[in-house]
Structure formats: structure tokens, C-alpha cells
Amino acid sequence: MAAAAAAVVGWLGWVLAAFCLGSTAGEAAPAPGAGLLNFCTEEDSAPGAGSLRGRAAPEATLCLRLFCSGLANSSWTWVAAEGAGCPEGGRATEPEEAAAPTGEWRALLRLRAEAGHPRSALLAVRVEPGGGAAEEAAPPWALGLGAAGLLALAAVARGLQLSALALAPAEVQVLRESGSEAERAAARRLEPARRWAGCALGALLLLASLAQAALAVLLYGAAGQRAVPAVLGCAGLVFLVGEVLPAAVSGRWALALAPRALGLSRLAVLLTLPVALPVGQLLELAARPGRLRERVLELARGGGDPYSDLSKGVLRSRTVEDVLTPLEDCFMLDSGTVLDFSVLASIMQSGHTRIPVYEEERSNIVDMLYLKDLAIVEPEDCTPLSTITRFYNHPLHFVFNDTKLDAVLEEFKRGKSHLAIVQKVNNEGEGDPFYEVLGLVTLEDVIEEIIKSEILDESEDYSDTKVRKKTVALGAPLKRKEEFSLFKVSDDEYKVKISPQLLLATQRFLSREVDVFSPLRVSEKVLLHLLKHPSVNQEVTFDESNRLAAHHYLYQRSQPVDYFILILQGRVEVEIGKEGLKFENGAFTYYGVSALTAPSSAHQSPVSSRQLIRHDVQPEPADGTRSCTYCPDYTVRALSDLQLIKVTRLQYLNALLATRAQSLPPSPENAELQAIPGSQTRLLGDKSRETAGSTNSRPSIPVEESPGRNPGV
């Protein structure tokens, strides 16, 4: 409202300037006096036209037709001798007859030439005292100073209006409470001035209007009383100096200039107090200071909800058929599926929490499986999928293809479901109409339509194929997605049966808890293939009739060994030291770490999963030049049937070489170091045996072999 009032006052200022221009034009124009334009004689023998100076015969009577102006201004015409002046208030020579006006611009004058006195005569007219010559114009320097002063006054008034009075009281309070130090100081000085802001605004508007009107009058006089140049010049100067320049300066340094200009604002109010006071009261009544608070409260209540624009635009103009995922692109399960390890692995890799279940054909969706329903399902039980779906019996959510997105979003918000099955009535061809399933629509599809962007997550099976874009490669490599199917192998690959879950747990335990198998030494992929080797997975059958049988002893005191053992199932008895201290251990305890590394002493104690030894984890060089002998100072004996992991020193060294080969780029020089997953490079084993035999005087300890397979990894 304050800006509108300022615009109205500015318009009134221009009207006042135009009125002053008209009044000045009326006062500055001289009164219409008599002026001779031309004359001619009426006799045929005389010249047809003459100038102001003519020649006549003696005693001749002349009849002159005068063309002059100002005949109605009490003027008359007479003939005066050349060189004679015009007496004040009288005539120099009485004409024979006075000039008789015959029109607005014409008059008839009769003269008689005297004989014997040839002389020249001048035709003269009288002008009344009101029609004198115009006053002299002011000097150019005075006009320039006056115009500059008026422009400066208009610019200062406009600048004070834009700087000191532009901030609302609420904005000043916000700056005083939460602004910077400079802003707080400026706000404290401006806050009292906002109390008489209406009077100050009225005073500044009045001064700006007066300055612009006076400038228009001044330029009109300087332009020779020509209105068009005066108006254009005044408008250009006021626009550039009085509007643009204050707006540019105040827009950047408003808070810095406003506190320093408060004195000028008070002076303007004092000079124009009789007019500024009532105008200020009027502006304060029209400003409605509570409007800002009402708008803030409306936004706080949610009246200015930005979602309304989205719902009126995109969501109400598009249907679910525009954003659905076709049925052939959806991840679904058959109702006759058995939940074994491979099926559960595929569900986990899909990354979805809701999976449709169909019967016979994909368009016949009968159930919905939630990922949380599989929390208590064991892969070894091979539970039928129909058993799980009948137990939970999740409802299905169907929508028609012409349903608007805003309606679907409201249903999703109510928690009914975050996945809907889109169907339509197919009445094509002969026969009764039927429902045809087109695809699926999810909450993610609706959100992508709102934000007009693809949501990239770990799975995109339900993403909109119509707007799917190629994923931009990231600068940093993504973390490898866990491939659970690596742990699912054929049953005939093991001599000892090991479940995929136990294989996964063993691989993670060794890579995280045992330093010699950490990813820095042995990669997870190589370790996995090592654990899947038939000679590594072994069983010990406990003989109740002969508890002290030789095959019950995994380690014996002072007997050299070259293998590492991890107990997976069963219990063992450990006897330590000369005192013969005995204790029992169970699953996931391991022994013989020093057998895989460079021996630091002749005897080492057993290592459990709760007590790691850091000083014996440096691996021996792969060339096998050092001794492979390790003599434990403890005895480990089975107390029940055991399932264990047994890794020999040669197998461990081959795993180190395979890991090193994976980290090297492929080239002819390192071709011998290439390790193929799931197979064995015989060259590595042969070279290791040859090197060990050449550096050790006694034969190396043989490595377990299985038919058709090589002994290492």
C-alpha cells in the first residue's frame, strides 16, 4: 500500500508540473500588440506591393491596404518623419483618416503627400503598455545550478524513501534480533524512525514532487518556451538521476546509508509538516501493518502449502498408466516356488520389500510377499512360498489405469499400501469384458513424477522405463554388491557337506578375525575358493571305543606340522605346557597360525578366536626358501565328531600368490601368477614343491590330495 501511495503522489507531481508549464506559458507570452506585417496600394497606377519604406508623388492621396496584427489592442497607425521619435502618449502626424480595420489582420489607411517638402516618412503603430518586450532570460550558469539543485533534491528524497523507509517494522525487528553486528546496530537506529515513517514518507514525496515540477518549469523557460523539448529533457533527467541512481545506490548500501540519513528525513518532515502530517496519517491507515503477521500465520497453519501447486499441476493431469512399470519388467515369484537358498538369494539381490506372487501366468497376481515375512524362514527347510503367503495373507491393492496420481498418492499416504496393481477393463473383441493387469505402480513412481527426476537406488526393477536414463558413472568405484550365489555350490563338490550359511560365516570370520587371512593378504574371493576346496573341508569321526585313537589327535606336542585348523562343529581338548593344563574348546576356535607364517620360536601355544597373536602374522616369502617346520607345545584331541577347516602351508602360499596375481595387470611377465577361480594352477604347486625340496635337506611334508584335483589353490 505504501508503494501504491508513493506512485499516486508521483503521478500527481507530474500533473502539477504540467499545470505549472501551462500557467507559465500563459503568463510569459506577451499581450497581442500592433505589428505591421506588409502593405500595398489600392490604385492601379501605384506599385502592387511595397515594403515598409515607399515613394509617392506630391499632393497625391494614397490608399494603403495594411496587413498587421494587434488591431484590437487599441492601436492606431500614423506616418512619422524619418528620424522623428514617437512622443509619449500622442501621435507624430495626424493622418487624413484613421486606419479602418476591415478584418482581423487587415486595415485600410488613406494618406496625402505634401507638396514642396519632399522627405521620407515612416509608418508607425502604437503598442499599449501591456504588450512590451519580454524580459531577458537568465544566464546559462544560473539555469544549470538551478537544474542541478532540483535534481539533487529529487534524488535525495527518492533515496531516503528507498533506504530508510523500505524496511517494514517486522524486518527491522528480525535484523535487530538475528542479524550481524552491523545489521543489529543499523536496526537499533532505524527502529525509532519507523514510528513516524508515514510522516517522513509524505514529506519526501512532497519534496520530490515539488522538485520535479520546478525542474519542468525551469527547462521550459530554458528551451525557449517550447513544451516538447522541456518535457523530454525533464523526464530523462528525473528518470536517470531521480529514480535509477537512488535505486541503484540504496539497493546495495541501504542499511549503511539509512541510519546516517535520518537527520535529513527529520528536516524534510519539519519543512513540510502541515502537509506531511495528514498525508502520513492517511498512508498509515492504508498500510495495514498486521498484514505481514497474517501471512506468516497463514503459512504456519499450512495455508500456503506448496504441495497444492504440484497436486493441481502434475498429479491431477497424469494417470497411473503414464508412470506404471510394465508387467514383464517386474520382479515376481510363482506361487509354487520353494524358498531354498537360491530363491532367497535372488530375493535379497532384487532389493525390493514387496514382491507380487502370481499363479500360472504373470497377469494373475494372487498374493503379495513382504521381505519381512522371510525373517524366520530357514533355507534348509525349503518352505513353499504358498505357505508363507497364506499365513500372512496381505491384501492386494488394485487401481484402474485412468486413476489420477493425486488419488493414488492419497491412498499411499493413508498406509493402505505402497504398491498398487494397475488394471483396466478389456472389452475388445467378442465375449464378456474382463480385467487385464497392465503393470505395477509404486510410491517411488509418484515421487519421481513430482520431482521430475529418476531416483537411483540399489534396484531399478520397478523404475519407469519410459523415462529411464543411463546412469552416470561415478568418480569413485561403488562397493561390490554381495553375491550370495557364490556360496551356493553343487552338493557333489564337497566330500564334507557344508551349508552355504556356514561357508559364508567361515569366510567372514577368517577375513575379519584372523590376521593371516585378512583382505590385505588374501582377497575374499581367493579365500572363498580356498574354503570350497575339498581337501580343506574335513571331518573327524570320534570313536567312542578308542578315545585315544591316533586320528583323534589334531596336534601333538613337539610334533612338526604345516597346517592351520579352524573348528567348525564339535569339541576338542587342549593340553598345554609341561604341567599338562587341560581345557575344552568348541566351534570357531583355531590353532596353528604360526604354521602358515615365519616361525618366531620353536614352540608356540594354541590360538583361540578370542586371543590373537600379532607377532607371528608376517607371511614367509613365497619362494619357499625358509623352513616350513612348526612344532607346537600343546596337544589338541577331539572329544566328539568334528567338522573343521584345514589349510596347509603350501595352500596358504598359493593363496597369497593368487591374490598378488589378481592385483597385477595382465601381461606376459606375470602370466604364471594368474589364478583362475574354481580351478588350480599346477605350475604354482610344482614350483613350490621344487623350491621347497631344493632348500630343505629332508623331504617336505606331503600335501593332501583328492582324486582329480590338485593340492593347492
Swiss-Prot record:
- Which residues are reported to carry the modification Phosphoserine? 667, 706
Q: Which InterPro entries match?
A: ACDP, CBS_dom, CBS_dom_sf, CNNM, Ion_transp-like_CBS
Question: Could you tell me which residue ranges the CNNM transmembrane domain spans?
Answer: 136-314
Q: Which keywords accompany this UniProt record?
A: CBS domain, Cell membrane, Glycoprotein, Ion transport, Membrane, Phosphoprotein, Repeat, Transmembrane, Transmembrane helix, Transport
Q: Where is this region: Disordered?
A: 664-713
Q: Which residues cross the membrane?
A: 7-29, 137-157, 199-219, 227-247, 267-287
Q: In which tissues is it expressed?
A: Widely expressed with highest levels in brain, kidney, liver, lung and heart.
A single GO cellular-component term on record:
plasma membrane
The processes (GO biological process) annotated in the record are: magnesium ion homeostasis; monoatomic ion transport
What Pfam families does the record tag this protein with? CBS
Attached carbohydrates are found at 73
Q: What residues does the CBS domain cover?
A: 324-385, 392-458
Protein location: Cell membrane
Membrane topology field: Multi-pass membrane protein
Name the PANTHER family on file.
METAL TRANSPORTER CNNM, METAL TRANSPORTER CNNM3
Q: What does this protein do?
A: Probable metal transporter.
| Miscellaneous comment | Shares weak sequence similarity with the cyclin family, hence its name. However, it has no cyclin-like function in vivo.
Similarity remark: Belongs to the ACDP family.
Protein's recorded name: Metal transporter CNNM3
**Organism of origin:** Mus musculus (Mouse)
Per the record, the gene is Cnnm3
